[in-house]
Amino acid sequence: MSRLLEVSDLRVEFSTEDGIVHAVDGISYGVDIGQTLCIVGESGSGKSVSSLTTLGLTRGRNASVSGSIVFDGRDLVTLPEDEMRSIRGNQIAMIFQDPLSSLHPFYKVGAQLTEAINTHQSVSRSAAKERAVELLAMVGIPDPQRRVDQYPHEFSGGMRQRVMIAMALANEPKLLIADEPTTALDVTVQAQILALLQELQDRLGMAIILITHDLGVVAEFADEISVMYAGRIVERGSDKQIFLAPQHPYTWGLLKSIPRLDTPRNEELVPISGRPPSLIQRPTGCHFHPRCPYVLDDHKRIDPPLTPVDGDPGHEAACLLSTELRTRVWKGLAAGEESAQLRHLVVEEARPLPVSGSHRLTQEADQ
């Protein structure tokens, strides 16, 4: 497969009265034609900001953007706004998490669909409406000839999200960004929407970036997964690598907090302790160390880079523990062992790390 999107060392900072918000801090990833990349993380991890920046939607908002976002051979970071408008909603489209607030309540859905069509295509009003009916049928809305003349409040939550998908696909984009598209929906409708996206991807050949806080949502949908924390990617790999052999304590926490049908009835979910850090005054060393059950003194001063797991560049993690020790800890967690017991294993077997050029040493918190 050929590369469609290449994000390199992307940094997005916002100037506020309280200081500089480091929303995205040097992330890199790529998406191939027809591929699905899932970006997972808690609220405030930077996953949505990175995608909004891809669409040029952070421009003029006290934002400083550096790095590159190369889409189809053009760097979107430096692209003039008039050229960006020809890409936004056309070659790259986005679905937002709340369809009710994304759709205008005073306009019929057909009018909103035809507006999306006419923005990038020179077609007649009748041809645009005919296309709108086709789009509603394509996303599984029954009786599209009648429903194209209805208002958003006349649709259920799941049907409104289907309308948003239809609008995003109006111009057959090469890349679809779906930002928490199932958050406001019940579990059954979530599965229907994800199945619809996968079906449309197979039919149209587009790439998808799915943004979510729930690893359970992406289990059978992702080709690759990037886990974000505090503006950085802390682990990335294939779906099998992330679910079967995760290598970062934050990923472990996300996985252990997912409800599973095969979990014993008396086994409780394990929440991730603490809260995400301030992106203005970030922790020294590993940004996850204040919440990590396996933190050692070295982790509070050394900032770990993403490094290949067992030499595999397709699976990387930003953790100072050895791959062997991380693997043993995860196997213990998967078998139901307590974090306290596994922490004892880490303390006993981890060796102090020398500071080298491959590790960033931080002496104090960001000012």
List PLM regions with ranges.
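Short catalytic/signature loops enriched in Gly
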Residues: R3, P142-R146, S238-L353, H359
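P-loop NTP-binding/switch modules centered on Walker-like glycine-rich loops
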Residues: G56, I177-P181, L185-E267
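Conserved ABC ATPase "signature" region
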Residues: R74-D75, A127-R146, L255-K256
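Conserved ABC ATPase signature
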Residues: Q150-F155, M159
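A short, proline-enriched helix->beta-strand linker immediately N-terminal to the Walker B motif
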Residues: A170-K174
